[in-house]
Design a protein with these regions (language model features):
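Extracytoplasmic
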Residues: 1-192
């Protein structure tokens, strides 16, 4: 069984462990083969702010600022209107269910998934929450695989035999990756 520590004291990730703002969650990872790896976490925010959860990641002494995205939902699906008939944006709520995502490189302009080159052997890893508290249930360390191109992916699928066109409605989202995302109507022929 893996040993986890919070601020140097033993911690068990059974149902969940609370990682409060400023606390350090540390563990070791035994890597079997040299290569590029990514770290995933199953988590839920405890005191969500209107931004991603920033964390300090230390691997064998080297440090990096990483982020975990938070998911958001509208408190009400029906938008009220003000006296001028304009829609009023409902209260934003952080999704309270557990979800899994990979650590993102906060210093990268595109905030891509953080890829760590690791050698065979045991590595000391620690995560320090810098902006908000989380409940963590699982931590994954997985060998990174370069995504295949769409052409390669579609070549593996059976040929399209669908003769109908389907239209998907996308205004009523269930969750969103940013609390400021809003559905909006644009009257622009170029968008059709």
């Amino acid at each position: 069984a893996e040993t986890f520590k919070i601020n140097g004291k033993a911690a068990v990730i059974g149902n969940a462990v609370e990682l409060k703002d400023g606390e350090v969650l540390s563990f070791t990872a035994d890597i079997e083969t040299d290569g590029d790896y990514i770290i995933g976490i199953e988590y839920t925010p405890l005191n969500a702010l209107y931004m991603d959860c920033l964390m300090n990641l230390a691997v064998d002494g080297g440090e990096k600022i990483v982020s975990l995205p938070l998911l958001w939902a509208d408190a009400a699906s029906e938008y009220g209107t003000d006296r001028m008939g304009n829609q009023i944006v409902p209260e934003q709520l952080a999704v309270s269910e557990y979800y899994t995502d990979w650590l993102h490189d906060y210093g990268d302009t595109d905030k891509n998934i953080l890829i760590l080159p690791l050698k065979t052997g045991v590595h000391s890893i620690s995560l320090t929450s810098e902006s908000q508290s989380l409940k963590v249930t699982k931590i994954y360390i997985k060998k990174y695989r370069e995504p295949v191109s769409y052409a390669e992916y579609s070549a593996q699928l059976p040929k399209n035999t669908v003769s109908e066109t389907y239209t998907l409605e996308a205004e009523e989202y269930s969750v969103k990756s940013d609390s400021f995302i809003r559905a909006a109507s644009r009257k622009n022929a170029a968008l059709y």
